[in-house]
Amino acid sequence: MIRTALLSVSDKNGIVPFAKSLHEQGIKLISTGGTAKLLAENNLPVVEVSSLTKFPEMLDGRVKTLHPMVHGGLLARRDFPEHMAALEEHGIDTIDMLVINLYPFNETVAKENCSFEDAVENIDIGGPAMLRAAAKNHQDVTVLISPEDYAPVLAEMKANQNVVSYKTNLALAKKVFAHTAQYDGSIANYLSALGDDLDHKARSAYPETLHLAFEKVQEMRYGENPHQSAAFYKDIYPVNGALANYKQLQGKELSYNNIADADSAWECVKSFAGNSGGAAACVIIKHANPCGVAVGASALEAYQKAFKTDPSSAFGGIIAFNIPCDGAAAQEISKQFVEVLIAPSFTDEAKAIFAAKQNVRLLEIPLGNAFNTFDFKRVGGGLLVQSPDAKNVLQNEMRVVSQRQPTPSEMNDMMFAWRVAKFVKSNAIVYCSNGMTLGIGAGQMSRVDSARMASIKAENAGLSLKGSAVASDAFFPFRDGLDVVVNGGASCAIQPGGSMRDDEIIAAANEHGIAMIFTGTRHFRH
């Protein structure tokens, strides 16, 4: 049973009404510093920790709760007679509830003008010590670190005469240890990223030790293959617009492959937000590769154009829009087998149409342009870490290297093709025209084979490549790749450049009479 609660929070959100409810339940309130002052200002009877310990706060508040009167009350096992006898001998009362959140270290170091001294002063010492003590003794102590837990714990107390179940206490203790581990990991990451000069602005993006924290969203029936187990974890604080922010409206549970493909689709279609002249964009993904991408005046038109690229591969694919999915688009999509459909929102008409196809997984994700801090790739015994491929080359940063200048329509097509090529597995070749992909060659060990594959894909779909734009995610190492795409029908090409044979490739472009652009940026994707 809870009789005494110690409250000391940096996040004051909801603490006053929570403390009032505790007081109304007959619970004694103990507090420190600013929290005690706030409670007193709201006419709540509160005992200062310094009155409890008979020792004043000292060292600018660095020492206030590190005392046996506090930790004895938290750590004593109520079912151990010798523990209770020791408390009685030393005049220590039990503390049955601890409500704490820690100094805002992460928020402090996120500030551009943060000094090393600011960072160090926001390393909490007493808070984690109390949290760990209370969580260790979760059999007897209820410990809360988040305002979101106030209401459910209060409800349980009111229903059970101030008793909180062991199940609840254990769940809260698990949350505490995850939180303190993350907190200490953040401190270690920050300090090990600093150089000898301790310059906040010059700290490395890659600390000497890297501590990561994720929380489990779900366990899955299996992983990439049925014999593999799997689970999906998300960042503690996913960035704006990330797949992990999805809300599933209907459909079966997402599989491992669904989530991997959905991420590819969503990241690709997001790249058209604000870059498509206000047009709708649609991306169709199969095995993490785009098999159709298009823009149009509506979601329906964008989908129809994207679907034309490779109808057979689109079967059982993942579809994403950068605008709301309306009834017209939903009606057309419902004619096909679709695993997952993603959009910023769905109209009521679209929802009604898909309600008849309950196996289709509908995901709503708010649009956003933020990127993960890091991309990761697990290797044997280690982890490759890099910044995300977030660079968008602007038109004025590109260089026309051919004798012939591209026409405005060719420039638009090349920009479109370049945006798509970034999301195709290397080696990537993408043909585009009039805001839609015509043929995509992905994942071949030879660039010339990817070029041939893209041409074959277009031919199989009955699409003409005459006058199309072609994008290559990396430079053409030899002229044979360029010869293949030009013979296929391309009138212009966009590529990074940087080959030892650039002069030979440029000469080939001039020989063919096509326009060619160098971006200076490569987009390998493995």
Swiss-Prot record:
Which keywords annotate this record?
Answer: Hydrolase, Multifunctional enzyme, Purine biosynthesis, Transferase
- Tell me where the transmembrane regions lie: none
The source's domain of life comes to Bacteria
Q: Name the pathway.
A: Purine metabolism; IMP biosynthesis via de novo pathway; 5-formamido-1-(5-phospho-D-ribosyl)imidazole-4-carboxamide from 5-amino-1-(5-phospho-D-ribosyl)imidazole-4-carboxamide (10-formyl THF route): step 1/1; Purine metabolism; IMP biosynthesis via de novo pathway; IMP from 5-formamido-1-(5-phospho-D-ribosyl)imidazole-4-carboxamide: step 1/1
Domain MGS-like stretches: 1-145
This protein's GO cellular component annotations are:
cytosol
Q: Catalyzes what?
A: (6R)-10-formyltetrahydrofolate + 5-amino-1-(5-phospho-beta-D-ribosyl)imidazole-4-carboxamide = 5-formamido-1-(5-phospho-D-ribosyl)imidazole-4-carboxamide + (6S)-5,6,7,8-tetrahydrofolate; IMP + H2O = 5-formamido-1-(5-phospho-D-ribosyl)imidazole-4-carboxamide
Q: Which NCBIfam families match?
A: PRK00881.1, purH
PANTHER family listed in its UniProt record = BIFUNCTIONAL PURINE BIOSYNTHESIS PROTEIN ATIC, BIFUNCTIONAL PURINE BIOSYNTHESIS PROTEIN PURH
Domain commentary? The IMP cyclohydrolase activity resides in the N-terminal region.
Tell me what this protein is called: Bifunctional purine biosynthesis protein PurH
